[in-house]
Amino acid sequence: AYAMRVDTFPDDGEFAGSDPDLMFRQLIMEAGADIAILEPLAFGARLPEAAQASAIATNLWIDEHWLSSTTNWHQRWRGSISVAIEDPEGAAREIEKWAGHPYMAQILIKAEPRPSWGDPRYDPIWQAATKHDITVSCHLARGSFETLPIPPVGFPSYNHDFMVSYSLLAANQVMSLIFDGVFDRYPTLRIVLVEH
């Protein structure tokens, strides 16, 4: 919500970007996009169980509110399978549940939880992604304070300082994927880093 366009707030006062008809007009018709991949960021729970419950609810909401035949009549919305990376087994179950959905285009994770992605504990996620040939996307998220990236000069004072630090987090996660052998174990795994 820090960088939302003011014109994305619907007339009914709901959250920015929450109205499929308004977003269709702005993102598809006016911007000229062929499709739009939705990346809902509904995380922030400190407990893995709560993060998993949030991911499950988000997927149900995306399916009902954005991908139904009523709101996706034009077939140009694509959803993201939100998963709680903190609960790899639960995340894999959620991937299995939604992998066959015709409009779920990718798996959505966040970068902040520790340990880094190369840790074998995350293998159920990578295994499910490669089994179903679905790209894993990581979008910037705002985790709890102790999970945020810390720049070499200390904690950020301003939002723009904080945003720049995400490139460090992304670089560390990519190094972990490579050096900890994830791409050796799952050579067809595809990962996209958004806004890093």
Question: Each predicted region: which residue ranges?
Answer:
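Helix-coil boundary/capping segments in enzymes
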Residues: A1-H196
